[in-house]
Each structure stands twice: as C-alpha cells, then as structure tokens.
C-alpha cells in the first residue's frame, strides 16, 4: 500500500469544514481551503509526478475511472480541463470503505462543481453511450488488478478514450522475457479479496495494443532499491521477502494515435 499521509487541520474560522473532513474516511490527501488537508492513506501530492500527466489539459475532456475521493479529477480541473467525469462504484456505493460524501465535500470546498461531474457506474458498464461519449484523456489508476475481467474492462476503457490512457496498476514477473500474469485467489495479495491479478510490463503493453491503443510507454516503475527496502521491511514483519521484492507498481501511457 502507498505511504500514510498526515492531516493538517484548518486555521481559525475553518472549524466547520475541518469537522466535516474529520467525520469521513479518506483515501486521498487533498489540500482544501483554509490549510486543511484530508487525512488520506495516499500522499497524492508526493506521488503525482510519477504519473507524468500533461502540464496543461486546457480544453480537454477527462474521464477518471475509480475516482474515489477525487484527487486526480480535481487535479485535472486545476490543469484546465474543460469537462471532467469522476466515475466510481465500489468506493461510493457502500461496498468499500470509501464514501461518496468525501468526494462531494472536497469538490464543493474546492469550487469545482461546474467542471467536475460525477457518475455512479461500475467499470464493467463503461461505454461511450453510458457516459455521454468519448473523453480525450482517461485515468485508470489502481483499478485494473481489482477487476475479475480486466481485459473486458480495458476494451471498454479504450472505447471511451479518444487520445491518452494513463494506467497505474500492480505488476510482477517483470524478469520474464515474455508476457505473463499472476493470479491471486482469495485475499492472497495484500490481504485484500478484491485483488485478483498482476501483469508484467510485456503483458500490459500487449493487452493495451490488443484493445486498440497504437503506442505504449512506461513512465514509472519502482527502482530496485525501493523494492528491496519494502521487501526487507515486510520480512522484518514476518511477511514474504520474495513476494514484496518481485511485486511492484507500474504506470503506462497508452495513445490512440
């Protein structure tokens, strides 16, 4: 899991917003007015450079699949996107520990209600008809390995994407010279029964081309020292060194043209 975040409560006069923030569970760390940062699990501002998002999204439309608390949807709005659709189901409909109220509170506090729309929709239901057409840019961050039918969802995501897909997911078996995947029955991966698959880099690139993307580029992988440090920590905690060392996160850009 990503590193824990810290929370900075609001300045005098921000008590109402601070209290609302404190009453909700947060996965994303989002800077809100008044010096308030939501107490998220992920330090999003720190990891944001890994994604190599376009510096300007002026005039672009963006689809954020698995938006959760909305950090990346709001970041797209900050970068000038003309229309952002935050889409989620698991984190908003009560199946997960997230709450849609957190997304709505952050959107309202940031003043993005006119730019960032939301839709409760499962990734398996995505289609241009279901979400109102194609989007220039699609974000699929931390979603793919939770899906029972990842290839089917990739086809749906490709149909909804006009230019660029940013994909972030679990990855392993990257030392193999051919496409490969690992399956995790039950709660074998990180103790989470919703974690199903890890693909290696070759497999991800091949699947992205198969579903309709013309080119792919890996923009981030954990360096060796980072994987070793994480594996050593897990071994100290009585967990598997090998599993942690060979598992990683990977971010790819896939383009239509």
Across the structure, where does each feature detected by a protein language model lie?
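Active-site flanking residues adjacent to catalytic metal/cofactor-binding acidic residues
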Residues: 63, 87, 141, 167-168
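S-adenosyl-L-methionine-dependent methyltransferase catalytic module, highlighting the catalytic core
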Residues: 124-135, 139, 148-257
């Amino acid at each position: 899991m990503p590193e824990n975040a810290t929370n900075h409560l609001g300045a005098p006069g921000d008590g109402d917003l601070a209290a609302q923030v404190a009453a909700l569970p947060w996965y994303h760390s989002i800077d809100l007015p008044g010096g308030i940062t939501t107490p998220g699990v992920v330090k999003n501002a720190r990891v944001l450079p890994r994604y190599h998002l376009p510096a300007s999204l002026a005039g672009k439309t963006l689809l954020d699949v698995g938006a959760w608390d909305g950090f990346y949807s709001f970041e797209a709005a900050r970068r000038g996107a003309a229309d952002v659709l935050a889409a989620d189901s698991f984190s908003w409909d009560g199946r997960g520990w997230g709450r849609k109220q957190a997304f709505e509170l952050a959107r309202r506090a940031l003043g993005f209600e006119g730019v960032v729309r939301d839709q409760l929709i499962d990734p398996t239901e995505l289609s241009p008809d279901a979400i109102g057409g194609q989007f220039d840019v699609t974000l699929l961050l931390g979603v793919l390995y939770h899906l029972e039918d990842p290839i089917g969802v990739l086809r749906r995501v490709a149909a909804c994407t006009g230019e660029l897909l940013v994909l972030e997911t679990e990855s392993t078996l990257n030392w193999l010279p051919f496409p490969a995947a690992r399956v995790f029955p039950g709660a074998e991966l990180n103790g989470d029964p919703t974690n199903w698959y890890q693909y290696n880099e070759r497999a991800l690139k091949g699947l992205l081309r198969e579903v309709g993307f013309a080119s792919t580029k890996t923009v981030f992988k954990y360096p060796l020292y980072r994987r070793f440090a994480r594996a050593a920590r897990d071994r100290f905690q009585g967990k598997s060194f090998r599993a942690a060392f060979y598992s990683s996160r990977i971010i790819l850009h896939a383009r239509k043209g």
